[in-house]
């Protein structure tokens, strides 16, 4: 299977922070069906924490509006019955200038609609950065058709990440993860004829092929899955990559202006900084466990969720460290970037109290 793609070409795209699924290597695997393939990615910048706990993250790939666009696509003039799920790239890159050789982690591609880890895990692997290569990447294959009209069948395919070895005095951005999915509306059960029903995997860089303690690793992956959520919110700024590409006319020969166009890569860029993911989960992220009294759950779930969703939407539009967040029925609240749940609660309480005084209500 290694001969199917040029691995060094994909590794080079990882080094340049380019899209793996936007590569010609992926287009070649689809052959004549390449122009029908939808390509989606999500890029997340994730924070470390001052407590030194493991960083945990979960993310979905396809948004609800994107899925609807895919459903609307016709196949030879007919509505598609299936959505073929193809390739999933996962690339993790350090955003730290030093100490990268101490960073390692676990990653899993799972189906969160299942109840047991052994049936849910599509693939799992461990990785370790090096001083010369502070990044890791792997290309996975799902190669399965699901019901295109079933939201759960598509939305339950998610990535789980656990990062270790990050020590900080204060919270800061420590890493970026890019994952994606190629999918094709179809009325056929087999689409990738070069691999038939096989599911090859390509370790691109710094993937640990043999773990030291398999039982401990298995238990850790089970814990990751058991802690996952099936209810994530779609957010992020949209970006289009690898536009204007065409399929080769003869063999690998691509002539500018000729050949059928292939679709560009749709990427969502987002950050997990400053978001309480128990309530706002466009990604679900944890940097330390909170006691129940600290978690904000005693403080009106609906109210906290509503406010934090507004905060997340505003944060997705801005990359500054100092911003204004507006919530319905609340006065403008200043968020500086270091608030705890209690800080947010106090600010909202004061804003509500002030609003009530202005209107003569309680």
Swiss-Prot record:
GO biological process: symbiont-mediated suppression of host innate immune response; transport of virus in host, cell to cell
Keywords of this entry: Host-virus interaction, Inhibition of host innate immune response by virus, Suppressor of RNA silencing, Transport, Viral immunoevasion, Viral movement protein
Keyword Transport part of the UniProt annotation: yes
Coiled-coil ranges (or none): none
Functional summary from the UniProt entry: Suppressor of viral-induced RNA silencing.
Organism: Citrus leaf blotch virus (isolate Nagami kumquat/France/SRA-153/1984)
Keyword Transport among record annotations: yes
Protein's name according to its UniProt entry: Putative movement protein
């Amino acid at each position: 299977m290694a001969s199917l793609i040029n691995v060094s070409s994909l590794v080079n795209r990882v080094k340049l922070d380019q899209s793996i699924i936007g590569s010609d290597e992926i287009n070649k695997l689809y052959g004549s069906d390449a122009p029908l393939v939808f390509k989606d990615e999500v890029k997340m910048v994730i924070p470390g924490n001052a407590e030194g706990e493991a960083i945990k993250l979960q993310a979905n790939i396809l948004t609800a509006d994107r899925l609807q666009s895919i459903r609307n696509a016709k196949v030879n003039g007919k509505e598609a019955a299936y959505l073929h799920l193809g390739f999933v790239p996962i690339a993790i890159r350090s955003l730290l200038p030093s100490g990268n050789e101490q960073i390692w982690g676990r990653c899993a591609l799972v189906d969160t609609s299942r109840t047991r880890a052994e049936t849910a895990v599509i693939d799992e692997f461990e990785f370790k950065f090096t001083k010369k290569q502070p990044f890791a990447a792997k290309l996975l294959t799902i190669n399965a058709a699901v019901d295109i009209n079933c939201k759960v069948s598509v939305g339950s395919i998610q990535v789980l990440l656990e990062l270790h070895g990050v020590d900080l005095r204060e919270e800061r951005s420590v890493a970026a993860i890019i994952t994606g999915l190629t999918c094709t509306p179809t009325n056929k059960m087999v689409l990738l004829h070069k691999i038939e029903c096989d599911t090859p995997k390509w370790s691109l860089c710094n993937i640990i092929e043999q773990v030291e303690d398999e039982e401990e690793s298995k238990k850790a992956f089970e814990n990751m899955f058991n802690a996952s959520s099936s209810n994530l919110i779609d957010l992020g700024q949209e970006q289009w990559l690898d536009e204007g590409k065409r399929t080769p006319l003869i063999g690998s020969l691509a002539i500018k202006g000729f050949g059928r166009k292939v679709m560009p890569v749709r990427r969502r860029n987002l950050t997990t900084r400053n978001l309480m993911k128990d309530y706002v989960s466009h990604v679900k992220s944890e940097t330390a466990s909170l006691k129940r009294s600290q978690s904000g759950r005693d403080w009106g779930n609906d109210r906290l969720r509503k406010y934090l969703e507004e905060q997340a939407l505003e944060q997705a539009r801005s990359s500054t460290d100092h911003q204004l967040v507006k919530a319905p029925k609340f006065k403008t609240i200043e968020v500086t970037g270091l608030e705890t749940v209690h800080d947010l609660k106090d600010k909202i309480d004061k804003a509500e109290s002030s609003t009530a005084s202005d209107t003569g209500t309680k």
